[in-house]
Amino acid sequence: MPGMPQKVIYPLMEQQYADEEKDLLEDEPLDSKTYDMENLKNKICELLDREKLYLNPEIRVSDIADRLFTNKNYVAQAIKSRMGKNFCQLIHYYRIKEAIRVYALNPDIQMNELAHRVGFNSMTTFNGAFSRNTGYTPAEWCKEYRRKNMDDYDS
């Protein structure tokens, strides 16, 4: 049975993530006294920094919730209320941060390999996330990075 083309699958997956986030955030507001959202936000960031769960292209809100022994509603609410992002935006932020780190260590890496290495399954999604998080396309950013490093080298 032939699979669906990536151009079809990945936008559908992103829509599924967005729909899941919307469903989670439409639940009754949680009482902030019962769970410290700022503390949870810090735990989410620590977990992502330490274990790099964002490298998994199939990561879900529930994966983080399970690791923190809480429920996905709390996680989604902490991300939205304390970081001003939805889950997908947060994961993309971490992936782009990692892409920049990897590129700095290996500036000869191909963009499709870099995108895959940091958890993106689609170049379209990678390019869009990169632009939203840096203000540059990946090609523009790489060109500027090389120029800056050459200027530093010449100094």
Where are these regions (language model features)?
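Key DNA-contact positions within bacterial/archaeal DNA-binding proteins
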Residues: 73, 123-124
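Membrane-proximal linker segments that couple transmembrane helices to downstream signaling/catalytic modules
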Residues: 3-116, 129-132, 139-155
